[in-house]
From Swiss-Prot:
The keyword Repeat does not apply. Belongs to the ribose 5-phosphate isomerase family. One of its GO terms (biological process) is D-ribose metabolic process. Pfam families: Rib_5-P_isom_A (PF06026). This is Ribose-5-phosphate isomerase A. One of its GO terms (molecular function) is ribose-5-phosphate isomerase activity.
Length: 219
């Protein structure tokens, strides 16, 4: 079974958490694209969705699902998103698709965060296989990079990428993130940082892992 099939399996299993007449939150990325495609089968049963990226908004519209802005809702029953890494405590690194800030905004609206991944995304320590994305206001890029070096990281500017918010991304290598909550707070306090890709303060509530044996739910 290839990686795409495992992603589709996890995405399909997440449909069981979608309530009729609800507005749901969706993230962004390849696994979420599979979920949006599967969600199309329920378009007549839900009110619509709030998306964490312009790309996801376009895919939802293509499926005939009404798109709401985050400003139009006060809360969401569920938020469904993928991850670049996830640890046993359901904390994640996200932001490979540069949508991390909007993903945190929509996740914060949700009563339940459902993370859908394939087995390759499961790690014991965050930062062990994936660089940590940090969204930065452009004028602070060099200043923030120096601070990240001082903290022990090796930041690289993600060339040619501008976020949906008009900012830039620094990918930080060589961070073994032993205390994700404290690291998330510390990085977010650096002037010029919009947010970083550690999702520990708002971790997932449920993980659905697509495996060769089927979808595995971890609550």
């Amino acid at each position: 079974m290839d990686q795409l099939e495992m992603k589709k399996m996890a995405a399909a299993a997440a449909l069981q958490y979608v309530k009729p007449d609800s507005i749901i939150g969706v993230g962004s990325g390849s696994t979420v694209n599979c979920f949006i495609e599967a969600l199309g089968s329920m378009r007549d049963q839900i009110k619509g969705a709030v998306a964490a990226s312009k790309a996801s908004e376009a895919l939802l519209a293509k499926q005939g699902i009404e798109v709401f802005s985050a400003n139009e809702v006060s809360s969401l029953d569920i938020y469904v998103d993928g991850a670049d890494e996830i640890n046993p405590q359901k904390m994640m690194i996200k932001g490979g698709g540069a949508a991390l800030t909007r993903e945190k905004i929509v996740a914060a609206l949700a009563k339940k965060f459902i993370c859908i991944v394939d087995t390759s995304k499961q790690v014991d320590v965050l930062g062990s296989t994936f660089a940590l994305p940090v969204e930065v206001i452009p004028m602070a890029r060099s200043q923030v990079a120096r601070k990240l070096v001082a903290l022990g990281g090796s930041p690289e500017y993600r060339e040619g990428v501008v976020t949906d918010n008009g900012n830039v991304i620094l990918d930080v290598y060589h961070f073994a993130i032993m205390n994700p909550v404290e690291m998330e707070k510390e990085l977010n306090n650096v002037p010029g940082v919009v947010t970083n890709g550690i999702f520990a303060l708002r971790a997932a509530d449920i993980i659905i892992v697509g495996t060769p044996e089927g979808a595995k739910v971890i609550e």
